[in-house]
């Protein structure tokens, strides 16, 4: 998100089943967008870091959607966090959200069976853990430095 040539880079590692990540997307990300991305000071990169099997499946669904639907899917899943993560059958709830976004049941089922995507996601998580010491979500890295996930810490690092 933002100008690829922006002078600063904010990287977010997140899990779709992380309540703190949902709060970050609701409260902090809009401030980052308004004050840092829209002003050209920074670009924002989201990286999947699913913390459990349900999160892996949810992240897989966002990746199976057309690229232009990725951010809307993530936003929808976070906005409806409690309604799908706490269901007795969260996969059915996830399938319903995917359907609303235009993903049919066949594509949804095929997506969840995609072993290559699943293994690729696990591999990336391992890389992020080794390279950036990511071990929880949300993890925020600004210009290569891990910072707290509040807006003031992020802005302070950008303005350094």
PLM feature spans:
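Structural alpha/beta surface segment adjacent to cysteine/selenocysteine redox centers
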Residues: 22-99
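A short, structure-level motif marking secondary-structure boundaries and short turns
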Residues: 16-19, 78-81, 109-110
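Residue-identity detector for threonine
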Residues: 9, 17, 39, 62, ...
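C-terminal cap of thioredoxin/glutaredoxin-like
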Residues: 15, 96-160
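Extracytoplasmic thiol/disulfide redox context detector
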Residues: 1-52, 122-131, 160
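Stable alpha-helical elements in mature extracytoplasmic
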Residues: 6, 17, 25-28, 57, ...
């Amino acid at each position: 998100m933002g100008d690829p040539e922006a002078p600063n880079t904010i990287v977010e590692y997140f899990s779709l089943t992380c309540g703190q990540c949902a709060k970050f997307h609701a409260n902090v990300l809009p401030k980052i967008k308004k004050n840092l991305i829209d002003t050209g000071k920074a670009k924002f990169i989201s990286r999947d870091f699913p913390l459990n099997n349900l999160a892996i499946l949810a992240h897989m669904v966002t990746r199976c959607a057309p690229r232009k639907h990725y951010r809307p899917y993530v936003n929808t899943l976070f906005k409806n966090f409690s309604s799908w993560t706490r269901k007795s059958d969260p996969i059915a709830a996830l399938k319903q959200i995917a359907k609303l976004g235009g993903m049919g049941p066949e594509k949804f089922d095929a997506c969840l069976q995609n072993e290559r995507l699943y293994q690729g996601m696990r591999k990336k998580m391992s890389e992020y853990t080794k390279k950036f010491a990511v071990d929880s979500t949300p993890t925020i890295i600004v210009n290569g430095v891990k910072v707290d996930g509040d807006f003031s810490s992020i802005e302070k690092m950008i303005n350094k």
